[in-house]
Amino acid sequence: MRVALCALPDVREATRMCLSTLPRPAAPPPPEVIRAPIWTTWARYKQNVDQEKTLTFAREILRHALPASVMEIDDKWQAGYGELDFDLTKFPDPKGMVDELHALGFAVTLWVMPFVEEDTEAFREGSELGYFVTSKRRTGNLKPGFFKWWNAPPVVALDVTNPEAVDWFVTRLKRLQTRYGIDGFKFDAGEPCFLPRMFETREALGHPSEYTRYWVERVASRFALAEVRTGHGTTGVGVLTR
């Protein structure tokens, strides 16, 4: 083990010295995610979110003379985890909603994660193409390859070491942007602790945390307005880490 000892005048100088050894992004995250609050539906409604509540939330923000910055539509906007399209029962006119939020001055982002539940078209398509992390061992009483993530149904994980799988996922996100005018995404999860026991990826990982690095570098970095909650060796990626 190598141990480096530093002697500097104060904590600020020590921090600056340490930061100087890390990669820096070519550009910072967009100003709108730093200078003003990110208004997330999760803080107000948790999973009980829909189109009318989202618009009501935005109008209340403006009525209280607070800044219109980023409106982040969080968990349960999809019909199923990983579908990457709106639940039309809860959001009957997604394009109209996004247009109205834009007119009010908000940028609009959506919550996404690299996990897909079984009872979805995304799972059927991705499974046929071999786009998910696999496992020959069960996690508890779940099917091989499946695991529990928070309070979601059992899910599988996108294989971020597989370039075709990454392109498939990113293409579906960009389709959302084109169809509805979405400005960016909140990229949740990405930690290897959620993955199934004895998991296998197309490209072998040097250590499990490389899954996190690939999630940020290969997916989140493809979008100008991106927020992540985790990172590993990704200080050079110009995304907001919350």
Name the predicted role of every residue range.
Residues M1-S69, K95-E100, L104-V108:
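Carbohydrate-recognition beta-sandwich/jelly-roll modules
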Residues P67-R242:
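Aromatic- and carboxylate-enriched substrate-binding clefts and catalytic-loop regions
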